[in-house]
């Protein structure tokens, strides 16, 4: 979980860790033989600690199912942000925060095939996942969109089997690279979960039923297991598409062929160095030119 007050994803991650370690199911054992699974339950520990303190302060002796109450709305400073009150899910491309820098460094090292980003949304909502709707960034390989549909179909079928409410797309678009969608530019399929937020006590829904926090965690947990199974079945084909796409992007037929971007020197060396360091952190190659050149648009 990247937002500290959206806790069901982090708690589901703990269940996933236990399941992968303890299970003797053949499917799980085969998965562990063939895959490297990296689980980072809490990207924002400071925000989660702040949210946990709010729960401790505002919780009563009996569960409060009214989502208008303080335990559900919280107060400032909210747990969404990190210690510096920065929303980490806007920072993937800019790398201004230490948490983001560490996460991006890990992604660059392992180059995962998929990345799951578990969130929460309004308490009267249900569950949303991909595929995203338009606008979709035109610099993303079509193969990632294709595979996103495959993963979404498997996940949706599992939800249907369990009679769980969910929807896809709607307000979820893949355009701005400051979100976790940023990984698509590295050839990784980003998968978003948005679970209605229960704030641990649960919430009374319009039809009168109570949705528990346990259910929220279970939705995130099952989604992850399904996504891992889909990856296991399609990993080789995804690698082939990744290889073909990367090879084409550096070929003479690519729209990116024969292009260079020149950063002109200025008197502000500090800003120039900051830009250069951010580009290098994103594994963008930089060369220093010492010769006279001419350029045209």
Language model feature labels by segment:
Residues 2, 43, 120:
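Active-site metal-binding loops of divalent metal-dependent hydrolases
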Residues 2-7, 11, 15-35, 84, ...:
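Intrinsic-disorder/low-complexity accessory segments
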Residues 32-51:
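Short, conserved secondary-structure transition motifs
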Residues 49-67:
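Aromatic- and acidic-residue-enriched segments that line the glycan-binding/catalytic groove
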Residues 55, 66, 70-74, 102, ...:
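Alpha-helical scaffolding within the catalytic cores
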Residues 65-70, 142-146:
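Short acidic/polar alpha-helix capping motifs at helix-coil junctions
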Residues 74-89:
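Active-site-adjacent "subsite" loops/lids of carbohydrate-active enzymes
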């Amino acid at each position: 979980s990247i937002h500290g007050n959206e806790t069901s994803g982090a708690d589901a991650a703990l269940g996933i860790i236990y399941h992968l370690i303890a299970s003797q199911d053949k499917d799980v054992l085969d998965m562990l033989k063939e895959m490297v699974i990296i689980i980072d339950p809490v990207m924002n520990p400071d925000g989660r600690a702040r949210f946990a303190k709010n729960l401790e302060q505002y919780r009563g002796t009996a569960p409060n199912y009214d989502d208008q109450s303080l335990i559900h709305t919280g107060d400032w400073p909210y747990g969404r942000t990190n210690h510096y009150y920065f929303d980490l899910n806007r920072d993937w491309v800019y790398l201004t925060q230490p948490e983001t820098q560490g996460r991006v460094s890990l992604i660059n090292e392992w180059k995962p095939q998929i990345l799951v980003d578990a969130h929460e949304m309004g308490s009267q909502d249900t569950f949303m996942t991909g595929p995203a709707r338009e606008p979709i960034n035109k610099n993303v390989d079509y193969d990632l969109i294709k595979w996103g549909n495959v993963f979404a179909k498997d996940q949706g079928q599992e939800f249907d089997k369990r009679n769980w409410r969910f929807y896809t797309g709607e307000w979820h678009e893949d355009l701005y690279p400051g979100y976790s969608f940023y990984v698509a530019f590295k050839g990784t399929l980003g998968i978003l979960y948005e679970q209605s937020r229960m704030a641990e006590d649960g919430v009374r829904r319009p039809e009168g039923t109570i949705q528990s926090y346990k259910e929220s965690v279970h939705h995130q947990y099952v989604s992850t297991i399904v996504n891992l199974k889909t990856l296991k079945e399609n990993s080789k084909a995804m690698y082939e598409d990744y290889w073909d796409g990367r090879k084409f992007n550096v070929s003479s037929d690519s729209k990116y062929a024969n292009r260079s971007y020149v950063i002109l020197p200025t008197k502000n060396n500090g800003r120039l160095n900051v830009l250069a360091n951010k580009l290098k952190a994103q594994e963008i190659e930089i060369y220093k030119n010492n010769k006279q050149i001419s350029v045209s648009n």
